[in-house]
Amino acid sequence: MSSGGLLLLLGLLTLWEVLTPVSSKDRPEFCELPADPGPCNALSQAYYNAVQHKCLKFRYGGCKANPNTFKTIEECKRTCAGK
C-alpha cells in the first residue's frame, strides 16, 4: 500500500473514532440487559433500553433484579445513556 493510501486510511480511521459516540464506548455491559421486574412488590424504577437507546420506567418487583435497574431516570442516564 502506498504512503498516500496509508494516510487516507489513517484519516478515515481517525474520523470514525471522532464520530463514534462516547456514551456507547463507556456504557457498562449490564446496560444491554432487558428490564427485569423480579418476583416481589411492584415499584417504579428505570432501566436502559438498548434498542431505543434511552432510559425508560418499568414496574420492578423489589428483589432479584439484574444490574440494569435504577431508582431514577437520571441515575440511569448518568450510567448508561451518556451525557
From Swiss-Prot:
Residues 1-24 form the signal peptide. Its main location: secreted. Keywords: Disulfide bond, Protease inhibitor, Secreted, Serine protease inhibitor, Signal. It is found in: Secreted. GO terms for molecular function: serine-type endopeptidase inhibitor activity. It holds the Pfam family Kunitz_BPTI. PANTHER family: BPTI_KUNITZ INHIBITOR DOMAIN-CONTAINING PROTEIN, KUNITZ-TYPE PROTEASE INHIBITOR-RELATED. It comes from the Eukaryota. The keyword Signal applies. One of its GO terms (cellular component) is extracellular space. Gene3D superfamilies: Pancreatic trypsin inhibitor Kunitz domain. Disulfide bonds join C31-C80, C40-C63, C55-C76. Serine protease inhibitor. Residues 31-80 form the BPTI/Kunitz inhibitor domain. This is Stephenin-3.
